[in-house]
Amino acid sequence: MMQVTAQTPGFAADVTGINVAKLCEGEFAALYQAWLDFGVLRLRGQRLSDDELQAFSARFGPLEEIPLGRMPAAQRAKIGNRYVTSISNILVDGKPIGGLGNAEAQWHSDMTYTENPPPASILLGIEIP
């Protein structure tokens, strides 16, 4: 059963007791309301494929494709899903493992340069110190 625990009154909550890859409509409605209530939700222990992350994200509204811009062809080739990108400080053979490496690892707000920026971003942490 889903539980929402406030971390800071009115801002940020931990959500436990759910698997976001298998939410029924009622569970998603409760999760969505928690997002509206708290603005930031932390859901620990989620193990999602890129496609599952994309499907979960799409339940919040239309998705934006990764802006390729001036991204070199070698980095573009690493992108398996145009709606999910890997940002990592992990190197393999001296090269970053994700499409962006850790170039986006500093705080920023996604897509704010567009006329209608998205209302949210979803971060799936795989390996966190």
Residue ranges and their predicted role:
Residues M2-V40, R44-P129:
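Fe(II)/2-oxoglutarate oxygenase catalytic core
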